[in-house]
Amino acid sequence: MTPNIHHDKILILDFGAQYTQLIARRIREIGVYCEVWPWDHSPEEILSFGAKGIILSGGPESTTSPGAPAAPQHVFDSDLPIFGICYGMQTMAVHLGGATEAADKREFGHASVQVIYPDTLFSGLSDHPSEFRLDVWMSHGDHVSRVPPGFTITAATDRIPIAAMSREDKRWYGVQFHPEVTHTLQGQALLRRFVVDICGCQTLWTAANIIEDQIARVRERVGRDEVILGLSGGVDSSVVAALLHKAIGSQLTCVFVDTGLLRWGEGDQVMAMFEEHMGVNVVRINAASRYFDALQGVYDPEAKRKIIGNLFIQIFEEEASKRKQAKWLAQGTIYPDVIESAGSKTGKAHVIKSHHNVGGLPEQMTLGMVEPLRELFKDEVRRLGVALGLPHAMVYRHPFPGPGLGVRILGEVKPEYAELLAKADSIFIDELHQADLYDKVSQAFAVFLPVKSVGVVGDARAYEWVIALRAVETVDFMTAHWAPLPYDFLSTVSNRIINELRGVSRVVYDISGKPPATIEWE
């Protein structure tokens, strides 16, 4: 019998911190289900959610400012364990009768915390056992200057006298540092202490249990109806295809639109994996000529994106209309999409962006929605993919933009540009694998520059195209550093591209960080 993997769960109230989703991912890694909600979500829904504990996240606001987001009273009336992190600790302190003050300057970076009182949260945890000190990561401006009545100061640093506090009889805890980031060495142990030991959650959130749970849900939801899925070859849609095939077999039909803007050989790879090896029913639509015709004479990046997205919708809708038995549309929506679209009932919560999966499929498509990954973060999706038997290389490959090479060809998109770029990109990726560098960078790709540069071919001058290489290192893709790849490696890649691809005379390497640049060129 499938265990109820949602029975023991944690609720994270988001005050707008950049690390909030990381808190959720760390708790999921422990094996406990959790959700992220805006801090001002309705009291009725928060209490009816059935959480075994609540975490108050960090946030960019100041508790000393009028109208700053505040910890809701009903949270403290719930008798649940509460863990405030950074701003979460500050708003807890203010709400319960303590005080905060603004520091002379922000504290950002590594810090050493002295454990003063080893309460249930800190007991037995130390990076320097003889001194009861923890190496942590700080990122704050304000700090707690007076703890509320009934609270004990549990940790301090050289700069702030109250780095952590607790009220054990209520199971209320607060830390000024960030246990969710890897720089806090005992961070995962602290989160486990709260979630498992203090809240009493069982660790049921595992890949095997998630697969079993989703198979049961999908079968119950769709019955014997047919389901269609837009298969892109990306991680999310590939995992959805593998999961649904395991759940409903031949009831699933995947529609793979070959746009002519994919990675080199990707169309054949997708067909080989899903149709030939896994037995999934895949309809391949070769639409390259339609895409190149539609993009002719278009130079604006946003216009290109819209054309590519709208044409995908049109082609997908054409194919879906042929399948009269299809009652359900499957999509690869994942949990960050849900969080970012959630917004707030009061409009005060931190909203990052609005999400539209698959470019926003037409509302007139009267199909039910199946989104088996909507509770999962990207790292969980990858683990599910491996557990479902997808190749590691497919599941863990670098991100690829929805419009494909259409936004890696600057300016007008032409078939000959796409072919050159796909081959150059393939050489770059192949050499990264050969040098054991692929998994050491977060994303790497080539860009086609529509400018000609002088070169020498034999004894004659030639004006040929330029290829730019881009590789970045990042944790969250919100910020990124350019990857300092070895010179010898870059020389090898450049030589291969110039020697193997007729029409390219120059290769350059992009050394721009994000910000100010974005990761993609368009």
Swiss-Prot record:
Q: Which residues form the active site?
A: C86 (nucleophile), H178, E180
Q: Which GO terms describe its cellular component?
A: cytosol
**Record-linked Gene3D superfamilies:** 3.30.300.10, 3.40.50.880, HUPs
Please name the pathway.
Purine metabolism; GMP biosynthesis; GMP from XMP (L-Gln route): step 1/1
Q: In which domain of life is the source organism classified?
A: Bacteria
Q: Which residues bind ATP?
A: S232, G233, G234, V235, D236, S237, S238
Stretches assigned to the GMPS ATP-PPase domain: 205-397
Q: What class of enzyme is it?
A: ligase
Spans traversing the lipid bilayer: none
What UniProt keywords are attached to this protein's entry?
Answer: ATP-binding, Glutamine amidotransferase, GMP biosynthesis, Ligase, Nucleotide-binding, Purine biosynthesis
Q: What does this protein do?
A: Catalyzes the synthesis of GMP from XMP.
Quaternary state and interactors:
Homodimer.
Q: What is this protein called?
A: GMP synthase [glutamine-hydrolyzing]
